[in-house]
Amino acid sequence: MGDLWVLLFSSLSLAAFHGVRGCLECDPKFTEDVRTLLGNLVPLEVPDRNQLLDRQHKEITHISSKVSHKDKMLRLLAVRNVIKLREWLKDEFYRLGNETWKGVFIIQGNLLEIRQNLEKKLTQIIKNFSEVACSEDCIVIEGPVLDCWNCLRMTTRCFKGDYCQDEDPKTAENREISLYLIFIAEAVILASAVLLFHVCISHRRKMKAIRRTLKTYLEKKLEELVEMIYKDDGEKNLEFGRSNSNSLTGEPTCAESEMQTGT
């Protein structure tokens, strides 16, 4: 039994190293080895053995497809990581093969636990690798890379576009809303500045016009006042000159003439 396990897993390792084209289900040799290993876990006398093996084989080999198609960012995986996962799965099958047969329900529970652990490990490994492969720094990836969607083996060192996750729609929407609000705020600030500038310029022009009008008005009034003063002074000087001339010639003034006439 032990020699058979060694032989089967040796062929499994060789299949992993030679001609690996994709994730777990991408290698036909791997899927056949899983079927053989499952058959060694279930005795021949178990009822509906073939249906049980087919169901377990399908669920195990399709885990990679199940994980990869959840998100397009989960489609890339390094070949070395695929080999590690297969080695881990090999160890789990080997552990179950060394245990005593305890019935169909027990083996199904054990296989379910293996599938759940395999799915968790595969999801985490793919996420970690994709974050590195799709990083903005474009970190160099060593070794071949597998596209789990179409089982292609690539040597690309940096990945963009279809191989990387799109931006979260909510994040993009929030960014658009933020940019729109920033644009509105800038427009309001700019409009307020223009309006304030216009008000200040208009107020300044109005004040200049008012000062100019007031200055003109005051100058005009001042000229009128000066003219009135000059006119009054001229009349007084004229009357004073007449009085002096009458007194010198002996002619009575108008007031004296009236007084004499009255007498």
Swiss-Prot record:
Record GO biological process: acrosome assembly
Membrane topology type: Single-pass type I membrane protein
One cellular component term from this protein's GO annotations in UniProt: inner acrosomal membrane
Signal peptide feature range: 1-22
Pfam families in UniProt: IZUMO
PANTHER family, per the entry: IZUMO SPERM-EGG FUSION PROTEIN 3 (PTHR36470:SF1)
Protein name per Swiss-Prot or TrEMBL: Izumo sperm-egg fusion protein 3
Phylogenetic lineage: Eukaryota, Metazoa, Chordata, Craniata, Vertebrata
Designated gene of the protein: Izumo3
